[in-house]
Amino acid sequence: AMYRAMALYLLNHGVNGDSQEEIETACSGADISIEYKNGEQIVILNGENVNSMLRTEQVGNMASKSSANAKVRAHLLKLQRTLAEKNDVVMDGRDIGTTILPNAEVKIYLTASADTRAKRRALEYEQKGEPFDFNQILKDIIERDERDMNREVSPLKQADDAVLVDSSEMGIDDVVNAILNVYKEKVQK
């Protein structure tokens, strides 16, 4: 969520996602924090709750581009580690188990096929009554995966000690149960 918040900040400030220089110049103006209220995680960007603005394709694509920037990564790495030190957390992200929290007690590499993820994203848009182009969603997901797997700084990859959970053919309850089983197995050892 922090990378998405940074991406939202960059988009709101007209930053060109293909310009590493613009990203580096702008990123220091983003004050990102996480709060917890009634068991819900709330992402705060410069004093504003931005949870409802983080799940768009534009934000996801900018997050992928800006996350390749070493200055952005350094800025957010400190925030993420501090959050984990002060709280019991469940973090998701494309390099949590390899870079952010390499010593985490439980690591899960949750994945699904690009087609499955595109269908899920399209369903989100449909449920919100928002227009979407399935082929564009799929194309964006494939491009983002490629970009993230091949970036120089902290590429997307499964940590050696992470358990793979492929949710392509699973419903939400099945995914939750699979993750809980991994957690129980790791913690009860």
Q: Across the structure, where does each feature detected by a protein language model lie?
A:
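N-terminal phosphate/diphosphate-binding loop that engages ATP/GTP or pyrophosphate donors
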Residues: A1-T56
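Conserved, well-folded catalytic cores of nucleic-acid-processing
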Residues: N12-H13, S33, N69, L83-K86, ...
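Active-site phosphate-binding and catalytic loops of NTP-dependent enzymes
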Residues: D18-Q20, E35, D88, R147-S154
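Glycine/charge-rich, flexible interdomain linkers and switch-proximal surface loops
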Residues: A26, Q41-I42, N46, M91-G93, ...
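NTP-dependent small-molecule kinase module
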Residues: I44-N51, G60, A122-K128, E146-K189
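Residue-level signature of catalytic and energy-coupling elements of molecular machines
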Residues: G47, L76, V90, I141, ...
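ATP-dependent NMP and nucleoside kinases share a basic, alpha-helical "lid"
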Residues: N51-G60, S67-K128
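Anionic, Ser/Thr-rich low-complexity intrinsically disordered regions
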Residues: D95-I100, I108-K119, K128-D140, R144-V153, ...
